Amino acid sequence: MLMATAVPVANSKPDVDRLKSILPGVPLVESPFFDDILPTCDFDAETARVGRDLHEKGFAVVRFPDEEFDARAERIKNRLAPRFDFAGWRENGWKVNDGLRVQDAWTFDADVRAIAVNARILQILEKLYGRKAWPFQTLNFPVGTQQHYHSDSVHFSSIPERFMCGVWVALEDIGDDAGPLEYYPGSHKWPIVYNDQVGVRIAGAKRRASQELYHQVWEALVEKTHLAPEYFSPRKGDALIWAANLLHGGSCQRNPNATRWSQVTHYFFENCCYVTPMASDMFVGKLQLRRLVNIADGKQVPNVYVDAPYASLGISFRFREFLATMRRSLSPIARKIRH
């Protein structure tokens, strides 16, 4: 009997052009081939570092690239402070792990908007995700959120998934007793959890889904993987970029008299559908599509599915319409059997 002879295979370089092209629906920085592709990219050193950190840990820390940042931060604090009931929060909200916030202050505050549309941040994100980034939401906080760790992907996600990220920036120095941001490095690599996986259906449900439904899943995953949280106690102007599925939240604010002024900007990327998974039955025809405005130009961004405008596809994601279509397609005999 002839025996096959093992032939040693020489180490060959990966076909990077092929690796770049086979997963167009996955952000570059989330690609399993990112380490092979990165050396061939024309990135400056800072962008490459941010990319490596985002890919491996799910977050990256940068100095916010704005020469006017200090003055801008002071103006934001001075303008927004009168909107908050600090005394009431210290008396009641702090004790129940509640926070204070203003959503979408960019609509009336030029400095909030300037942070959201920072050209250098947009440039870094576009290079690392492979699609043009656009800001769609701002949140401004004067104190700690004290919010349970969570993935943003249950609140807003994209199709294809993971074309979303957040940028959190400190508007002042933040101490350890002010409820610093907490996050779980590496958790961004876990699968995104959807309603059906936790036994929740939106259509016909008597209660609305909430983030709390996912808490036990995230807690169990953290326990199983022995993942330890890290905490971000930054200097004014330090910013943290996080990936769509990174578990993050606000730690307990031990000192209710402290402030924790910060701004979060959430970004999507072009040529996606933008959805709210927690309010959707993702795989049976009911999506809560978001109709969002690009903060940079004030224009509504179209939902796009694999290079085609969603509106042009003639697809209905409304569950009742989906069921009605199915019923109309049934034969009279099938309908009789069904009833």
Regions found by a protein language model. Give the residues of each.
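Non-heme Fe(II)/2-oxoglutarate
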Residues: 4-40, 86-89, 197-199, 236-241, ...
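Short edge-strand/loop segments of extracellular domains
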Residues: 143, 184-192, 266-272
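Non-heme Fe(II)-dependent double-stranded beta-helix
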Residues: 2-151, 155-158
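Short, structured patches in soluble enzyme cores that scaffold and shape functional sites
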Residues: 140, 151-153, 169-173, 185
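Double-stranded beta-helix
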Residues: 176-247
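Short, conserved beta-strand element in jelly-roll/cupin
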Residues: 159-176, 233-236, 241, 266-271
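A short beta-loop-beta micro-motif enriched in histidine and acidic residues
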Residues: 152-164, 227-228, 234, 258-259
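Short, charged/polar surface micro-motifs in flexible loops or helix N-caps
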Residues: 131, 143-146, 174-176, 239, ...
